[in-house]
Amino acid sequence: MTIKEFAYSAQQHLEAQSGEKFKRAHIYELLAASFGYNSFAALCAESIVFQGKQASKHSSQHNLDLLRRCAELGYTSATVDIVFAELPPLIAKQRLSIVNIPELISKLRGESSYQNGYPEWDADDYDDEIEDNIIFTQSDADDDYYQDNLSPGLLAGLELAAEKGNSQAHYAIALFLMPDPDFDQTPGSEYWYTQEQGGRVLTGVEKEWADEYVQSINNAQKFEFHLREAGRLGNEDALLDLAEHFDDPSFFEQGSNGENHDPLRVAEIAESLGRIHDVHEWLTKAAEAGDTEAMRRLIEEFDQDDVQRCWSWVYLAQLLDTDLTRDDYYAIHEDGSHYDDDVGGPMYVDGRDGIKLPSLSDDQDALVRQTAKSLFEKMQ
């Protein structure tokens, strides 16, 4: 059942039970209140309503929200009581629940994988731990979290939101479809696809392989479409993924404050695009956030002509318990692993020299130490 169908059914049911007319728009508002939102517009801005596999749980706060919203819409106390008694069971009967899109995106960004067969979602192939945490209701209690398999209904809800210009919905779909770099296409699938395109009639496993290749093409096209749409609508995460996957420089051209991005990842992507200025900028952000390896690289590759700047990185690293001026050498095996005396065998040396910098005057040194201290305090 779609949300539109549910709203119509609920409207008919409540009118029959109360003898009072309900506006269809009010049903949507009451549905939103049942999930803890002040309005249906607020719900749609960050969540997807969909039909799951089990009834969602509602907290006492949700019940209060429903009572409040019903009264705000101008219904009599008798009608409010009927709505309170009748609407939650209707929602439970139809197994309606919500997924918060930002939370869904957060899970997918950490555990995204190649999804074979979209939109026919195969929940059994998805990691159980993610299933147990990814779908939930707006509840203030951990045991009220609603758990459900990722489903065609959820994807349909995301697509509907995407059609209405929701950049986060576009991005969530793109993450569903993001190709896994470790995914290996079945050997021969491209060959059999080419044969079928040439008019050969395939059967059995050859047909399965050709269909698998078609599906991978479709997934890749949908992935790029939704990613580009999310980027076009201003989603910075999507723009960064576009830079990584399609060498699209839009992320860097529009500028970003970097608060929500891993600066080392951004620096790596910038370097792959040959944007050296941006590499410097984002390594600096990483260093200012406390990454000592970024500090070392800045000293060696970017800030080497500014001795005071280099010393500020050295002193900042020291405040973070890292001495960049100390040589760091260690024994390894031939394969590069750290040397194990119990294993024995030939011993090799690996490592790197400590940073060597020209000395500063006392005044310069005091100024640089204060700069490092200020940067350190900003991290706290």
Predicted segments with their positions:
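C-terminal alpha-helical interaction appendages
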Residues: 1-87, 91
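Helix-turn-helix repeat elements of alpha-solenoid scaffolds
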Residues: 127-135, 142-153, 184-204, 212-221, ...
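Short helix-capping/linker turns of helical repeat alpha-solenoids
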Residues: 163-168, 173, 177-181, 185, ...
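Acidic, serine/threonine- and proline-enriched intrinsically disordered linkers and terminal tails
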Residues: 182-219, 324-355
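Long, ordered, amphipathic alpha-helical scaffolds
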Residues: 299-380
